[in-house]
Swiss-Prot record:
The gene is nqrE. GO terms for cellular component: Gram-negative-bacterium-type cell wall; plasma membrane. This is Na(+)-translocating NADH-quinone reductase subunit E. InterPro entries: NqrDE/RnfAE, NqrDE/RnfAE_oxidrdctase, NqrE. NQR complex catalyzes the reduction of ubiquinone-1 to ubiquinol by two successive reactions, coupled with the transport of Na(+) ions from the cytoplasm to the periplasm. NqrA to NqrE are probably involved in the second step, the conversion of ubisemiquinone to ubiquinol. Composed of six subunits; NqrA, NqrB, NqrC, NqrD, NqrE and NqrF. The keyword Cell inner membrane applies. It catalyses: a ubiquinone + n Na(+)(in) + NADH + H(+) = a ubiquinol + n Na(+)(out) + NAD(+). The chain crosses the membrane at residues 11-31, 35-55, 77-97, 109-129, 140-160, 176-196.
Length: 198
Protein backbone atom coordinates (compact mmCIF):
# COMPACT_ATOMS: atom_id res chain seq x y z
CA UNK A 1 0.00 0.00 0.00
CA UNK A 2 2.90 2.33 0.79
CA UNK A 3 4.16 1.95 -2.77
CA UNK A 4 0.83 3.13 -4.23
CA UNK A 5 0.60 6.12 -1.87
CA UNK A 6 4.16 7.04 -2.81
CA UNK A 7 3.33 6.73 -6.52
CA UNK A 8 0.22 8.91 -6.08
CA UNK A 9 2.08 11.64 -4.17
CA UNK A 10 4.89 11.58 -6.74
CA UNK A 11 2.39 11.91 -9.61
CA UNK A 12 0.56 14.82 -7.95
CA UNK A 13 3.46 16.88 -6.60
CA UNK A 14 6.94 15.70 -7.57
CA UNK A 15 6.20 14.79 -11.20
CA UNK A 16 3.32 17.19 -11.82
CA UNK A 17 2.37 17.06 -15.50
CA UNK A 18 1.85 20.82 -15.78
CA UNK A 19 4.50 22.25 -13.47
CA UNK A 20 7.32 19.68 -13.62
CA UNK A 21 7.06 18.46 -17.23
CA UNK A 22 5.14 21.49 -18.65
CA UNK A 23 2.71 19.20 -20.48
CA UNK A 24 -0.73 20.42 -21.52
CA UNK A 25 0.26 24.09 -21.50
CA UNK A 26 -2.13 25.12 -24.31
CA UNK A 27 -5.31 24.39 -22.36
CA UNK A 28 -3.54 25.11 -19.06
CA UNK A 29 -3.00 28.75 -20.01
CA UNK A 30 -6.16 29.27 -22.08
CA UNK A 31 -8.77 27.86 -19.69
CA UNK A 32 -7.29 29.15 -16.42
CA UNK A 33 -9.11 32.49 -16.43
CA UNK A 34 -11.96 31.37 -14.13
CA UNK A 35 -11.75 28.86 -11.28
CA UNK A 36 -15.08 27.21 -12.15
CA UNK A 37 -14.07 26.52 -15.76
CA UNK A 38 -10.57 25.43 -14.72
CA UNK A 39 -12.05 23.05 -12.16
CA UNK A 40 -14.40 21.56 -14.78
CA UNK A 41 -11.55 21.03 -17.23
CA UNK A 42 -9.41 19.63 -14.41
CA UNK A 43 -12.12 17.08 -13.62
CA UNK A 44 -12.38 16.18 -17.32
CA UNK A 45 -8.59 15.73 -17.62
CA UNK A 46 -8.52 13.67 -14.42
CA UNK A 47 -11.29 11.39 -15.70
CA UNK A 48 -9.59 10.97 -19.08
CA UNK A 49 -6.18 10.30 -17.50
CA UNK A 50 -7.70 8.01 -14.88
CA UNK A 51 -9.38 5.90 -17.56
CA UNK A 52 -6.97 6.14 -20.49
CA UNK A 53 -3.76 5.26 -18.63
CA UNK A 54 -5.12 1.91 -17.29
CA UNK A 55 -6.97 1.21 -20.57
CA UNK A 56 -3.81 1.78 -22.57
CA UNK A 57 -1.90 -0.33 -20.04
CA UNK A 58 -4.18 -3.25 -20.86
CA UNK A 59 -3.84 -2.66 -24.60
CA UNK A 60 -0.07 -2.33 -24.31
CA UNK A 61 0.43 -5.44 -22.18
CA UNK A 62 -2.13 -7.67 -23.90
CA UNK A 63 -1.67 -6.63 -27.54
CA UNK A 64 1.27 -4.36 -28.32
CA UNK A 65 4.13 -5.63 -26.16
CA UNK A 66 6.71 -7.94 -27.74
CA UNK A 67 5.25 -11.45 -27.71
CA UNK A 68 1.90 -10.44 -26.18
CA UNK A 69 -0.31 -11.88 -28.93
CA UNK A 70 2.05 -14.27 -30.68
CA UNK A 71 5.55 -15.26 -29.66
CA UNK A 72 8.11 -13.29 -31.66
CA UNK A 73 5.63 -10.65 -32.92
CA UNK A 74 6.36 -7.14 -31.68
CA UNK A 75 3.58 -4.60 -32.32
CA UNK A 76 5.13 -1.88 -30.17
CA UNK A 77 5.67 0.25 -33.29
CA UNK A 78 1.89 0.85 -33.13
CA UNK A 79 2.09 2.33 -29.60
CA UNK A 80 1.51 5.99 -30.48
CA UNK A 81 -1.38 5.53 -32.90
CA UNK A 82 -3.08 2.99 -30.63
CA UNK A 83 -2.68 5.15 -27.52
CA UNK A 84 -4.11 8.18 -29.36
CA UNK A 85 -7.05 6.09 -30.64
CA UNK A 86 -7.94 4.90 -27.13
CA UNK A 87 -7.63 8.45 -25.75
CA UNK A 88 -9.83 9.82 -28.57
CA UNK A 89 -12.53 7.23 -27.88
CA UNK A 90 -12.55 8.04 -24.16
CA UNK A 91 -12.72 11.80 -24.84
CA UNK A 92 -15.64 11.32 -27.27
CA UNK A 93 -17.61 9.41 -24.63
CA UNK A 94 -16.79 12.08 -22.02
CA UNK A 95 -17.86 14.82 -24.45
CA UNK A 96 -21.24 13.13 -25.02
CA UNK A 97 -21.77 12.73 -21.26
CA UNK A 98 -20.94 16.40 -20.57
CA UNK A 99 -23.15 17.58 -23.44
CA UNK A 100 -26.07 15.53 -22.12
CA UNK A 101 -25.80 16.03 -18.36
CA UNK A 102 -23.65 19.18 -17.86
CA UNK A 103 -24.44 21.54 -20.79
CA UNK A 104 -23.17 24.67 -19.00
CA UNK A 105 -19.74 23.12 -18.44
CA UNK A 106 -19.78 21.69 -21.96
CA UNK A 107 -20.38 25.19 -23.40
CA UNK A 108 -17.83 26.83 -21.07
CA UNK A 109 -15.08 24.42 -22.14
CA UNK A 110 -15.92 24.96 -25.80
CA UNK A 111 -13.22 23.88 -28.23
CA UNK A 112 -10.88 22.83 -25.42
CA UNK A 113 -12.93 19.74 -24.60
CA UNK A 114 -12.26 17.94 -27.90
CA UNK A 115 -8.68 19.21 -27.70
CA UNK A 116 -8.17 17.01 -24.62
CA UNK A 117 -7.67 14.25 -27.19
CA UNK A 118 -4.40 15.82 -28.29
CA UNK A 119 -3.50 17.32 -24.91
CA UNK A 120 0.09 16.26 -24.41
CA UNK A 121 -0.50 15.82 -20.66
CA UNK A 122 -2.82 12.91 -21.46
CA UNK A 123 -0.44 11.40 -23.97
CA UNK A 124 2.48 12.08 -21.63
CA UNK A 125 0.78 10.14 -18.84
CA UNK A 126 0.17 7.19 -21.14
CA UNK A 127 3.73 7.33 -22.53
CA UNK A 128 5.25 7.49 -19.04
CA UNK A 129 3.14 4.47 -18.07
CA UNK A 130 4.59 2.44 -20.95
CA UNK A 131 8.13 3.76 -20.49
CA UNK A 132 8.18 3.07 -16.74
CA UNK A 133 6.53 -0.33 -17.23
CA UNK A 134 3.76 0.17 -14.65
CA UNK A 135 1.49 -2.77 -13.92
CA UNK A 136 -2.30 -2.37 -14.02
CA UNK A 137 -2.87 -1.20 -10.40
CA UNK A 138 0.10 1.18 -10.67
CA UNK A 139 -1.32 2.60 -13.90
CA UNK A 140 -4.66 3.31 -12.19
CA UNK A 141 -2.93 5.15 -9.33
CA UNK A 142 -0.59 6.99 -11.69
CA UNK A 143 -3.41 8.02 -14.04
CA UNK A 144 -5.58 9.48 -11.29
CA UNK A 145 -2.59 11.03 -9.51
CA UNK A 146 -1.42 12.74 -12.70
CA UNK A 147 -4.93 14.06 -13.33
CA UNK A 148 -5.31 15.35 -9.78
CA UNK A 149 -1.91 17.05 -10.04
CA UNK A 150 -2.81 18.74 -13.32
CA UNK A 151 -6.18 19.82 -11.89
CA UNK A 152 -4.50 21.18 -8.75
CA UNK A 153 -2.12 23.24 -10.88
CA UNK A 154 -4.78 24.70 -13.22
CA UNK A 155 -7.18 25.54 -10.38
CA UNK A 156 -4.36 27.24 -8.44
CA UNK A 157 -3.37 29.26 -11.51
CA UNK A 158 -7.01 30.20 -12.16
CA UNK A 159 -7.38 31.39 -8.57
CA UNK A 160 -4.26 33.52 -8.87
CA UNK A 161 -5.39 34.94 -12.23
CA UNK A 162 -8.80 35.85 -10.79
CA UNK A 163 -7.08 37.79 -8.01
CA UNK A 164 -4.69 39.45 -10.49
CA UNK A 165 -7.64 41.04 -12.31
CA UNK A 166 -7.71 43.56 -9.48
CA UNK A 167 -3.93 44.05 -9.36
CA UNK A 168 -2.01 46.85 -11.00
CA UNK A 169 -0.04 44.78 -13.53
CA UNK A 170 2.41 46.74 -15.73
CA UNK A 171 1.13 47.24 -19.28
CA UNK A 172 3.88 45.14 -20.85
CA UNK A 173 3.03 42.13 -18.69
CA UNK A 174 -0.76 42.16 -18.89
CA UNK A 175 -2.42 39.02 -20.21
CA UNK A 176 -0.19 36.07 -21.00
CA UNK A 177 3.02 37.79 -19.88
CA UNK A 178 2.13 37.78 -16.19
CA UNK A 179 0.54 34.35 -16.60
CA UNK A 180 3.83 32.88 -17.83
CA UNK A 181 5.68 34.48 -14.93
CA UNK A 182 3.09 33.16 -12.47
CA UNK A 183 3.30 29.66 -13.96
CA UNK A 184 7.08 29.76 -13.68
CA UNK A 185 6.89 30.80 -10.03
CA UNK A 186 4.38 28.02 -9.35
CA UNK A 187 6.73 25.55 -11.04
CA UNK A 188 9.56 26.76 -8.79
CA UNK A 189 7.33 26.11 -5.80
CA UNK A 190 6.55 22.59 -7.02
CA UNK A 191 10.27 22.03 -7.67
CA UNK A 192 10.76 22.03 -3.90
CA UNK A 193 9.04 18.63 -3.87
CA UNK A 194 11.74 17.14 -6.10
CA UNK A 195 13.99 16.58 -3.09
CA UNK A 196 11.37 14.36 -1.44
CA UNK A 197 12.33 10.70 -1.70
CA UNK A 198 9.28 8.45 -1.74
Amino acid sequence: MEHYISLFVRAVFVENMALAFFLGMCTFLAVSKKVSTAFGLGIAVTVVLGISVPANNLVYNLVLRDGALVEGVDLSFLNFITFIGVIAAIVQVLEMILDRYFPALYNALGIFLPLITVNCAIFGGVSFMAQRDYNFPESIVYGFGSGIGWMLAIVALAGIREKMKYANVPAGLQGLGITFITTGLMALGFMSFSGVNL
